[in-house]
Amino acid sequence: MLRFLAPRLLSLQGRTARYSSAAALPSPILNPDIPYNQLFINNEWQDAVSKKTFPTVNPTTGEVIGHVAEGDRADVDRAVKAAREAFRLGSPWRRMDASERGRLLNCLADLVERDRVYLASLETLDNGKPFQESYALDLDEVIKVYRYFAGWADKWHGKTIPMDGQHFCFTRHEPIGVCGQIIPWNFPLVMQGWKLAPALATGNTVVMKVAEQTPLSALYLASLIKEAGFPPGVVNIITGYGPTAGAAIAQHMDVDKVAFTGSTEVGHLIQKAAGDSNLKRVTLELGGKSPSIVLADADMEHAVEQCHEALFFNMGQCCCAGSRTFVEESIYNEFLERTVEKAKQRKVGNPFELDTQQGPQVDKEQFERVLGYIQLGQKEGAKLLCGGERFGERGFFIKPTVFGGVQDDMRIAKEEIFGPVQPLFKFKKMEEVIERANTTRYGLAAAVFTRDLDKAMYFTQALQAGTVWVNTYNIVTCHTPFGGFKESGNGRELGEDGLKAYTEVKTVTIKVPQKNS
């Protein structure tokens, strides 16, 4: 989804500036062992009921890494049953002190930190993202998000209300119950943490379906959940496909809430399934076509760099990617030249090499989808300025691609490509670019680059997006809410707002013989 709070990490001079040099990063494990390939239900490793398995593929080579259990509806039923039992009144989990839930989450964070190199290596192997980003960005965020919500566990509570009459009134923030969670493949461990941490901090139990493209790191984290001491049934991890296992979670009558991160198209299906079943609570973090707007007074070098990383970070596989770059007419030509040169300099290659900036797309389907959009952009009349083809002969690599002369009615201007393709647009006036930026079904993020504070503040109010960045991009921390307007989803993850999605507010009113202030 995004680049976390490490704004200098991906700078021109040092992509590993949080460490003194690339040499300061630990060496990756090039062939990590794969100890877990079964479903994790009730703190036990189990085969799928059907005994089916499916392959997980190394996108760097296109070769099969191994096979994992293919869970489906029957396995979801088993997992939901375990989660419901763990959530019953009087269970060890329900009777556990909130501070103890926080201690378990902190313990989990410690275990992730202990195994950080292994987990980062596993993420790079299965997902294809550069190891230095897996280690320095993703794992850093994972550890922080578990610790952040651990701190909230005994601080998220109700309040007393001075209501009229002879009554004493207070509210309780209670866990919703069994939470179904469906996570994507672009940030497997991060998305797992974004969803697990607030759910567990507030006392829920979880049935999680992980992406079929990237199951390995999530399964290993399940082993750490057991090692940390979470009771059986509190967390259950299912590997399988969306139309079977994912749909079973969304439709399940004994799942109280579903949280999904992924495409807007699937988000519609999740919302419908929730409505057609038991009206379960729904949180959706979906797609985007986010604008980056560069005004003529912007710091040119900085804006070029930020807009480049806004799009190309994580191989363009971010829902909040800055996938529409609007540049004021008077600086458009210079910005375009610098942007093309920067894209040509981006190092594509083996993600285990510490100076690699761009790895492969996650799988063959995404690889072909992105190449299809590149061909479509050329057919529609956009000018291909660099890239536009595969890189190398093995794996799913695509050269960084920049289009100029893009028009708003082109499909590459309207649809989420989810790959390393940067379309550039020209604009003349502020009101014009605001209208064009907002003319989209999406509303996840936006950015504006300017030295004029008044203009910056005006844009932050005018842009229809859940997050607006000024003179930066992709800066997200566990402390700040993240989510979208319009068809980019509903609800928020992270921060204090992220806790609201996992609790019900109960009002308790007691008649008293006499009320005194």
Swiss-Prot record:
Swiss-Prot/TrEMBL keywords: Acetylation, Mitochondrion, NAD, Oxidoreductase, Transit peptide
Site, Transition state stabilizer: residue positions: N186
N6-succinyllysine modification, residue list: K52, K81, K364, K383, K399, K414, K426
EC number, as in UniProt: 1.2.1.3
GO CC terms of this entry: mitochondrial matrix
Name of the top EC class for this enzyme: oxidoreductase
Transit peptide per record: 1-17
Residues modified as N6-acetyllysine: K51, K52, K364, K383, K399, K414, K426, K429
Pathway this chain belongs to: Alcohol metabolism; ethanol degradation; acetate from ethanol: step 2/2
Cell compartment(s), UniProt: Mitochondrion matrix
Binding site for NAD(+): G262, S263, T264, E265, V266, G267
GO biological process terms held by the UniProt record: ethanol catabolic process
Active-site residues, Swiss-Prot/TrEMBL: E285 (proton acceptor), C319 (nucleophile)
Gene3D superfamilies, alphabetized: Aldehyde Dehydrogenase, Chain A, domain 1, Aldehyde Dehydrogenase, Chain A, domain 2
Purpose of the protein: ALDHs play a major role in the detoxification of alcohol-derived acetaldehyde. They are involved in the metabolism of corticosteroids, biogenic amines, neurotransmitters, and lipid peroxidation.
Sequence similarity: Belongs to the aldehyde dehydrogenase family.
Name of this protein: Aldehyde dehydrogenase X, mitochondrial
Species per Swiss-Prot/TrEMBL record: Pongo abelii
